[in-house]
Amino acid sequence: MFRKALMASLAFCTQIGVASDNAFPSTYQPLASEPTVIRNATILTGDGKRLDNADLYFDEGRIVWVGSGEAADNSRVIDAEGRWVTPGIIDVHSHLGVYPSPDVDAHSDGNEATAPVTAEVWAEHSVWPQDPGFSRALAGGITSLQILPGSANLFGGRSVTLKNVPAGTYQAMKFPSAPYGLKMACGENPKRVYGRRKTAPSTRMGNVAGYRSSWIKAQRYIDDWSEYERKITEQEATDTGAEGNAALAAALNKPPKRDLELETLAGVLKGDIIVHMHCYRADEMVTIMDMADEFGYQVGTFHHGVEAYKIADQLAQNGVCGALWADWWGFKMEAYDGIQENIALVDRPEGGCAIVHSDSDEGIQRLNQEAAKAMARGRAAGLTIPEERAIGWITSNAAKSLGVADKTGTLVPHMMADVVIWNQNPFSVYAKADQVFIDGAQVYDRFDVRLQPISDFELGQLIEVAP
C-alpha cells in the first residue's frame, strides 16, 4: 500500500506541464440549443466546397448534414434564400480582453515587458471578459479567437483560445481541449525594447542567441525530469521490502525544481504547445525555421509576415501557416516590403496555409472584408481564387493554426455547429452577419436586440435617442 502511494506521487510529479495544463480549467458549457435547419442558402463549407440553394442541419451543438437530408419534426426552420452561410469566423491574432476598451493605461495588460523571456505568463490571466470588443466581434461573425500576449519579448507567454460567448470569467469562454500557444517575437520589437535599456537583446543576433539559450535550458529541464523518473522507476523495479521503500521515498523527495517558464518551453519541445511567432522579414522566418529544426520543434504560424510571399514555398514545405494582414505595412522598417498579394501568394503552393488575422479590435469586426481585399488583389494578379477557397483563410486554416481543426472551422458532419448566416456574399463590402450560432445556440441576431449581447461594463451607459 505504501509503495502504491509512492508511485502515485511519482505519476503526479513526473508529468512536466500536466499540473499547469490542468490549472485554470475550462468551464465552458454550450448554451441551450434546438435542432435547426437552414434552407435554400449558398453555403461555403470551409473545406473548399460551395453548395448553391442548399440546406444545413445541426442538432445538439453539432453539424448533422449539409446539402440535403432529413431533419427532426420539431426543428426550427430558417429560410435563407438569397443569403450565404459559412463556418464561424476565427481570428488567430487578437488582444481583446488583455488590451480592452476603454483604452486606458489601467487596461494595458498584454505585455509583461520586464524581461526578454517571460514564457511563464499566461494571457488568460489578463483577459477581462467584460471587454465590449467581444460583442462587437460577435456581430462580425467571430465565433472563436486566440488571445495572445504582446510582442515586446522574445518569449511573451502562453496564448489562449476562446469561444466568443458572453461570460463572467475567461474560464467560461475557454475553448475546451484547445492546445495552448506560445507567443514569440523576432525582429525590431524585442531588440528595441531591451536595447533602449542597454541590456540584451539589442540586435537581431542577440534575439537569436536569447531563443537558443532558452531552448537549451528547456531541454535540460526535460532531461532532468526524465532522469528523475528513470531513477524512480528503476528503484521501484529492483528494491522491495522496507529498505526498498525507504530508498524509493528518499528518491521521491529530490525532484527537480518546478519552473513555470521552462514548463511552457518544455511543452513546445514535447509538441504540446503551438508556437505563434511575430515575424516580418523573410530571412528571419527562415532563421527561425532552422532554429526549430535544431531543437526539434515545429513552428505553427508566423504572424504578420509582410514578406511571407518571398518564401511561400518554404513555408508550405515546412508546414508553417502565415497569419497575415490584407494591406497593412510600412509602419516600421521591417514592415516596409509588403504587397497586397501576400496572402494569395502564401496560399498558392500545395500545402500553403494562408490566414487573414486582425491584430486589431476594429479589424476583427470586419475580418470577412479583410479576406475580401486579399482575394481581390490575388484575382487582380491573375490567380484563380473562388470564394469557397478564400473563406478558408478565416475558418479552416485558422482552426488548423490553433490546433482545433478537428472541432471547428468547417461545416461537415460531427463538427461544432459554429455557423454564420450572412445577408449576402460575405466578401461584399455590404455583407453583414444576420445570425450567429456557437455550438448550435444562436448568440447573435442583427434584427433582435435580445440577441445582441452587451458587456456588463456597458450596462446603464447606452442611451437610446428618440427618432
Predicted regions and their residues:
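Extracellular/periplasmic ectodomains of large secreted or surface enzymes and adhesion receptors
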Residues: 20-33, 435-467
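Divalent metal-coordination and catalytic microenvironments
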Residues: 41, 56, 61, 82, ...
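Polyanionic/metal-chelating signatures
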Residues: 133, 138-303, 432, 438, ...
